A protein has these predicted regions:
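N-terminal targeting signals for export/organelle localization
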Residues: 1-10
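Local sequence-structure signature of Cys/Sec-based thiol-disulfide redox active-site neighborhoods
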Residues: 13-50
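Thiol-based oxidoreductase modules, predominantly thioredoxin-like and allied folds used
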Residues: 26, 45, 50-70, 97
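Conserved beta-strand elements of beta-rich interaction domains across eukaryotes
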Residues: 28-30, 67, 90
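Extracytoplasmic/secreted proteins, especially bacterial periplasmic and envelope-associated proteins
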Residues: 36, 40-43, 70, 98, ...
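A short glycine-leucine-enriched loop at secondary-structure breakpoints
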Residues: 73-78
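Non-catalytic, surface beta->alpha helical segment in thiol-disulfide oxidoreductase systems
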Residues: 79-111
Length: 111
């Protein structure tokens, strides 16, 4: 199970021979919507951390915006939770309720 949030410094490519994208979950500990969404996110990550989507490996990163405001600012996060996909060429915001099926569809459609 994923514990807590990562900092921007925890982001790395653990799969150097694959094309890698990053899916960020931006939240804060005090947000009730983040607390509600976090278990669904963690379950989705657990189910998909070793899979590829359309040939691309996805790094899943939780960001605590209170502790890593620079990363939140970089991705223009203004509300919580916010989920964004960074493909290297584009940043795409996920605009649905963070549920496993919707996240899977988002990655399949975006990559």
């Amino acid at each position: 199970m994923i514990e807590g949030y990562a900092s921007g410094m925890d982001i790395r490519n653990n799969h150097p021979n694959e094309e890698v994208v990053t899916l960020y979950f931006f939240g804060v500990e005090w947000c009730p919507h983040c607390k509600h969404a976090k278990p669904e996110w963690e379950s989705f990550v657990k189910d998909n951390e070793n899979k590829t989507f359309n040939g691309k490996k996805v790094n899943f990163v939780m960001v605590d915006c209170d502790k890593d405001s620079a990363l939140a600012d970089k991705y223009d996060v203004s509300g919580y939770p916010t989920i964004k996909l960074d493909t290297g060429a584009d940043v795409i915001e996920f605009k649905s309720k963070p549920e496993k099926d919707a996240l899977t569809q988002f990655l399949n459609n975006s990559l």
